[in-house]
Each structure stands twice: as C-alpha cells, then as structure tokens.
C-alpha cells in the first residue's frame, strides 16, 4: 500500500486483542486505511456499522479485524453446540467467499479460531467435513448456507457477529429472502455485532439492511467521488465493425502488464478471448458457467502473472482482490451504472494508479448518459484513426482450445501507435 492510501492511525493504537494486532503486524499491516480508521472505533465499542468505500480500500480487513476481536474478547454463549458457528460472513459470490477465507487464514492461524467455508457449485462433502468438526467463523454464500442449515449441519442460534460483504450486490441478485431467512434463525440484532460493507450502498439497500441491524452507524470514504481519483478514464466511440480491431489496437498501444476486459455476455467474452488467444496473448476467460475449480485456477494464474489478460463478465467485478491490475477495458458499457464503478475499481487499488478504457459502441452507447450521471462527471473522449487500426489479425480461436491460452506471451516491441493526433 502506498502512504497516500493510509492514515496516521495505527492498529496498535486501538484496544484490539493482542493476538489480532500480532497477526496484522506479522502480515505487514501497521497503519489503517480510512475506512478501517472510521469503522474500528465503532465496532470495538459494540456499535453496528454500515461502511461504504471504494474497492481496494481495506473493507475486508476492517470487518475481519472487528470479527476476530469480538470473538476473542467475548465468551461464546453457554451450552454452544459443535454445529453452532459464532460468526457468519455472507458474500454474494463463491469467488468472494473464497477470497475472504484466504484473507482470514493468517488471523485464524494466530488466534486459534477455526474457519469454515460454504459455497455452491462443488466441494459439498469437503466443506461439510470441516463444519462437522466445529467452526468459529463461517464464510459463505446464502444458498449453500441455507442448505446446510435446513439439514441441521449448522445452527445459527449462537451467532455473535454477522457481516454482509458487497451488500448491494446481495440485494441486487435477489438474495433478500435468503438473507432474511438466515437472520430469522439468529439471536436478535441487539445481541450480536452487525456489519455491512460495500463500494456502493443505495438508500434502498441501506433501509433494507438496517432492518437487520441495531441502530447502525453509517460511515463512508470519499462519498462525493464514485470513481477513484487515481484512475484515468477514457472513452472511445467505435462502430460495431471496428470495435474488436480497436480493442486489439489499444492493447498493442498500451501493452498492459495486467488487464481485465469486461463484456456484458458470455458469448461476447468468448469471442474476445478467441481473438486475443489467436493473436498470442496469455489470456484467461472467466464467465458464470466456468466450473468452480477452473475459475479459481484462472484467477490464481492471473494473480500470479501467468496470464496477462482476463476476459470476464461481471462475475469478476465484485470484491475480488487481484493486485496490480494496470488496465480495465469496458468492451461493452454495462447496463447497470454501479457495475461501471465496480469494474473500473479493479484498477487503481491500494494507492496505485490505473487506466480505464471504455468503448461506447452502437449497441451500448445509450447506457453512457446514465453512467455519467451516476458517477457525477463526463468520461473524457479520445479519438482514433480508423485507417490505422490493426488489420493483420489471425482467425480467432474457438473454445475447443484451452480457455486459458497458455501459450507464451508474444515478445518484441508493440506495433506502431495508431491513435490519431
């Protein structure tokens, strides 16, 4: 993290449990980010919190620190059973649940608290085996949590801490009934610590969320600016026929170290992947129907640097901690204004600079006015020379080939720059 991303407030300044402070410092966390500095005084005093901050500002560590401190500082309820977790952290996607679990592991190792993970798609028996041995903190998606609860594999009657991460997406995806079902099986709101964190939190969502909280305190960081000030935003207006060639030309120009390309449909993502893989790029594909194990492998390869480009639907836009993403390309402008914020928030994280490039084609240009109204500013427009777009492009690959494009990255200098002056 850069110094500009941190505050003067140190974790050791708070009355945190010593084991929590030790674990944080061992991982190199000394100074708080703004959202952590705002949230911790409240949660340590037992106050419920609804926190809004840009992605990459430390929301996950804010609620994990609060959760571990609370459980270490307060005894479990009397007669707690082995199938009763003490804390429940709910996430909208499998990938985010896995990421939270990974972030929590160093704290669990240092404190002795046991973690459990519950998400759909695969691993049912493996996850259940961990739960049957007893866990203190259960992290998961609502569908699998309800499945385990209905079969009495877990009982929520001993919950002391509840977290909703990416709360707006939880509601947007229609999980409101699931969330309420789970809350009804917990102790009353005033008998537990409740936390909500998200990059965007509408008044509608805030009102719904507060039904399940105890006079929560609303905190936010940089509320006047929905897109990070370290992200350079840029917009092009290509025709549908020139759109793919423009994308490939921009990639040649920018030569990004690590880029995510977002499109609105699975079919479009597969099309983009095919063109880039054929052109020799180390590119991965992440859509909703990719098997869970393969999705996690692709994310790991992208994070390690084995892949340079990730083509994705919005499944990858929320909550994932992928470091050092230098560029985000919106091949399609999203239909949901909030998705624009979450997409470009993959870059410019943790105090770094980032670059977002959006293509307003004939099909999705009508989404632009609502996006610009939502973010509160116009996206700067750049022009290009149609005659200078790349033409020497190979035939795109089909998905009968490996999705992750494991061939070597093309070497040599980028082709000549093709933007008009």
Curated annotation (Swiss-Prot):
A GO term, aspect molecular function: RNA helicase activity
Q: Give residue numbers for sequence motif DEAD box.
A: 165-168
| Helicase ATP-binding domain location | 40-219
Q: Which protein, by its recorded name, is this? A: ATP-dependent RNA helicase RhlB
The protein's predominant localisation is: cytoplasm
Where is composition skewed (Low complexity) in this entry?
Answer: 402-414
Q: Which GO terms describe its biological process?
A: RNA catabolic process
Q: Which organism is it from?
A: Escherichia coli O157:H7
According to its UniProt entry, the function of this protein is described as: DEAD-box RNA helicase involved in RNA degradation. Has RNA-dependent ATPase activity and unwinds double-stranded RNA.
Keywords on this record?
A: ATP-binding, Cytoplasm, Helicase, Hydrolase, Nucleotide-binding, RNA-binding
Q: Where is this region: Disordered?
A: 392-421
Enzyme class, first EC level, given as a word: hydrolase
List residues of the Helicase C-terminal domain. Answer: 245-390
Matches recorded under PANTHER family: ATP-DEPENDENT RNA HELICASE RHLB, ATP-DEPENDENT RNA HELICASE RHLE-RELATED
* Catalytic reactions of this protein: ATP + H2O = ADP + phosphate + H(+)
Q: What is its EC number?
A: 3.6.4.13
Q: State one Pfam family annotation.
A: DEAD
| Record text on subunit structure and interactions | Component of the RNA degradosome, which is a multiprotein complex involved in RNA processing and mRNA degradation.
What are the GO cellular component annotations?
cytosol
Q: Which family does it belong to?
A: Belongs to the DEAD box helicase family. RhlB subfamily.
Q: Where is this motif: Q motif?
A: 9-37
CDD domains the UniProt entry points to: DEADc (cd00268), SF2_C_DEAD (cd18787)
Name the HAMAP family for this protein.
DEAD_helicase_RhlB
- What PROSITE patterns does this protein map onto? DEAD_ATP_HELICASE, HELICASE_ATP_BIND_1, HELICASE_CTER, Q_MOTIF
Q: Where on this chain does ATP bind?
A: 53-60
- InterPro entries the record matches: DEAD/DEAH_box_helicase_dom (IPR011545), DEAD_box_RNA_helicase (IPR050079), Helicase_ATP-bd (IPR014001), Helicase_C-like (IPR001650), P-loop_NTPase (IPR027417), RNA-helicase_DEAD-box_CS (IPR000629), RNA_helicase_ATP-dep_RhlB (IPR023554), RNA_helicase_DEAD_Q_motif (IPR014014)
